[in-house]
Amino acid sequence: MKKKNVLLFFLFLSCFVFLSVSLSAEQMYSPSWGYALDLPEDFVLANREGNERYLFQHAILPVDLQIALYEEPQFKTAKEAAEHVFKQLKMTHKDVPFVWRNKEALLSSVSFLYSPSEKYKPKELSGWVLSLELPNKTGWLVLLTYTDKDKAKECENLMISSLDTVYTDTMSYFETGPVTTALYPKTKEKTIEYTFNNKNISFTIDESDAEANKSVIDREFSVLTMYLNHDNLIAAWQRFYKIIFRDAWNRIAPASFAVYTSLFDENNQNGFAEKAAKELLFLVQNFNYERDRKGSDFMNLPQALTEKRGDCDSRALLMVLMLKQMNIDAVLLVSPNKSHAIAAVDCPGSGTCFTHNGRDYLGCETTAHVPIGEIADEIAAPENWFPVDFYVIENFESN
């Protein structure tokens, strides 16, 4: 399939090509166009033309990803940019128009025939097209991912994951991905009455949030399992948590603000990080412990928060996310050999510390009623853990 799709790439060169990559093949940023991608592991750059057309091919599954960039005057809408591709490749398509980052966008399931020449029988291909408007009238970004029609179901999660992890501006790092936004639109906000720190608080959550976040978890878990016997499993695992974190950011933000308001005392700001960490740890430690060994074994974060239940992963990630939203530095620590996850926070205190990026983080055991810094001896060794870093808004303030 790879040779065939390199030919397909050149055949439609006026339609697709690649960008100025300043990071690895999986994590890319284009300084000239201002967008970024965090592709699943093992996508390899197979071809490019300038900084406008790229072809990536996956090393495990037969999936291709083509990227095309167009100057702003070429089209008036994201739909027009997508229709340019539909016409050139003679695609049949089913469109889902939606709004992402306050701009009209288009997601389309597509199918088309391809043959490198008349000597070859046309082959049926299936996939997805995502068309986005870049900020500041920079231009249009169109992504096409596809595979053989008979492989479409097997490869769908990988294809969707590659499209859903695109970033077009600073705040898009904290925004539900475009594909999830299109497929799981907001429905109706509801108010949650909640008890935190012996206080009654309330916050809003959308009725679609739990299902949408669960869909991301299930999809990314499916992608993650491809790497179980591969050298880059840890990198894939880190990406798994980062994508869930990103999707949940806006879904959890109203709750984090309510918690912050209940804790913050403008007349006594000293020790706020320690206070917030202790209270959030107490909250998640009192969740009901539940696991779903049949699936991803990970409770979606909106449901974990509102229903106060989940396992170590969901509790620890929820705690880290809420601390980050209060501008408190925290990391997720995951131990494959111990099948465990904990939060770790940069705040005053004593106990088991983990050093990461030159900082010391106190371990937070979310599934036992112990204070910050108390981690069981049998799992406390640093070599048992790998860290997961997340984007924070302050990282982009100087950009």
Model-identified regions with their sequence ranges:
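Hydrophobic/aromatic-rich core segments of domains that either
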Residues: 302, 314-391, 398-399
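Secondary-structure boundary elements
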Residues: 237-307, 367
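N-terminal "mature-domain start" segment
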Residues: 26-49
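Bacterial N-terminal signal peptides that target proteins for export
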Residues: 2-10
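Conserved polar/disulfide-associated segments of primarily extracytoplasmic proteins
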Residues: 48-142, 149
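Bacterial N-terminal signal peptides
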Residues: 10-18
